[in-house]
Amino acid sequence: MLLRFTKMHGLGNDFMVLDLISQHAHVQPKHAKQWGDRHTGVGFDQLLIVEPPSHPDVDFRYRIFNSDGSEVEQCGNGARCFARFVLDKRLTTKKTIRVETKSGVIELRVQNDGQVCVNMGAPRLEPAQVPFQAEQAALTYRVDVEGQSVELAALSMGNPHAVLRVDNVDSAPVHTLGPKLEHHPRFPQRVNVGFLQVLDRKHARLRVWERGAGETQACGTGACAAAVAAIRQGWMDSPVQLELPGGKLSIEWAGEGQPVMMTGPAARVYEGQVRL
């Protein structure tokens, strides 16, 4: 059978979006891996699936697969594209929607200027919630990587993140240290790795090595995690403007126990069909 899909991106973080409300199919990890290949498939960082909700107090269910076939809990840039998609496809007329993910419910709001604001929920800071192996919670942790000691913050935005401060993101070891930390045994579910260069109290640059996808043009949850880490350590003040390779995101966080608000663009690229 043929399935209709939409190719979208949020700051260059690109997605294949499938509506499984008006069309019915059983999509499996092998399909995500097949379609995700940039040479022989559609090519994307993540596959986003729109499904009917399983609870009456939410509008949709949101599932996410990496291009390696692994299903993940959360994707911030994808959430913005999800909100634009369900409006564009007239699956809802609401400008504010509640969406269930593997890690909980998030709220998405499409603004009049076309930007999308996502309530990502409160960050989870306890090591067991990341999950990360540590005896007790701390602002930063020391992790040994092949004899090198690396200082990082570890937290969850519904998915696990490590954040490292660097002097210059252009020369940061994203492609060498990134995969080593992703698969480090202290992160039992693997981890997304952010390399953060603080410019001043309000502005920073960020590159992210994403679990299961490698370096991407932008990572929404990575931007949220980096902002939280920077604010907690006293480096920056909310709201924070983060510049990623694909563009800029605005992140607001009022402190522990409070939700992280992420605002940024979402763009449609093209429509297509793929064989299941």
From Swiss-Prot:
Does the entry feature the keyword Isomerase, yes or no?
A: yes
InterPro entries linked: DAP_epimerase_AS, DAP_epimerase_DapF
| Active-site residues annotated for this sequence | C75 (proton donor), C219 (proton acceptor)
Q: What is one GO cellular-component annotation here?
A: cytosol
Residues making up the signal peptide according to the UniProt record: none
Enzyme class at the top of the EC tree: isomerase
Q: Domain of life of the organism in this record?
A: Bacteria
Q: Name one GO molecular function term.
A: diaminopimelate epimerase activity
Can you list the disulfide-bonded cysteine pairs?
A: none
Protein location: Cytoplasm
Alphabetically, which GO biological process terms does the record hold? lysine biosynthetic process via diaminopimelate
Entry keyword set: Amino-acid biosynthesis, Cytoplasm, Isomerase, Lysine biosynthesis
The regions listed as transmembrane in this protein's record are none
Q: In which pathway does it act?
A: Amino-acid biosynthesis; L-lysine biosynthesis via DAP pathway; DL-2,6-diaminopimelate from LL-2,6-diaminopimelate: step 1/1
Which residues does substrate bind? N13, Q46, N66, G76, N77, N159, N192, E210, R211, G220, T221
The EC designation for this entry is 5.1.1.7
Q: Which SUPFAM superfamilies match?
A: Diaminopimelate epimerase-like (SSF54506)
- What Pfam family does this protein match (any one)? DAP_epimerase
The UniProt site entry described as Could be important to modulate the pK values of the two catalytic cysteine residues is assigned to H161, E210
Please tell me where this protein is predominantly located.
Answer: cytoplasm
For whether the record's keyword set contains Cytoplasm, the answer is yes
Annotated site location: Important for dimerization: Y270
Q: Can you state the subunit structure given in the record?
A: Homodimer.
Q: What is the similarity comment for this entry? A: Belongs to the diaminopimelate epimerase family.
Q: What is this protein called?
A: Diaminopimelate epimerase
Instruction: Give the organism's phylogenetic lineage.
Output: Bacteria, Pseudomonadati, Pseudomonadota, Gammaproteobacteria, Pseudomonadales
- Primary gene name: dapF
